């Protein structure tokens, strides 16, 4: 089964992705200066496509592949 992203969400500290296999990965905003200093309203203004998550107004992109390459696996749902 090919891994696909079924859900993307944020909280005050990170952006999360969930795969069709139930895996959840995250990237902390603190690791990205533009995201770390952004206002909550700016963080909430993101778009998703088949490659990753983009914050157009902040000029920041995070690829899904990058989420999954790191040891950031949280837990199955």
Residue spans for each PLM region:
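Motif-centric detector for short Cys/His coordination patterns
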Residues: 1-77
């Amino acid at each position: 089964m090919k891994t696909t992203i079924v859900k993307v969400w944020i909280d005050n500290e990170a952006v999360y992705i969930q795969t069709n296999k139930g895996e959840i990965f995250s990237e902390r905003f603190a690791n990205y200066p533009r995201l770390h200093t952004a206002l909550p309203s700016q963080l909430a203004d993101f778009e998703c496509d088949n490659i990753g998550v983009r914050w157009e107004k902040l000029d920041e992109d995070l690829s899904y592949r990058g989420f999954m390459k790191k040891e950031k696996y949280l837990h199955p749902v």
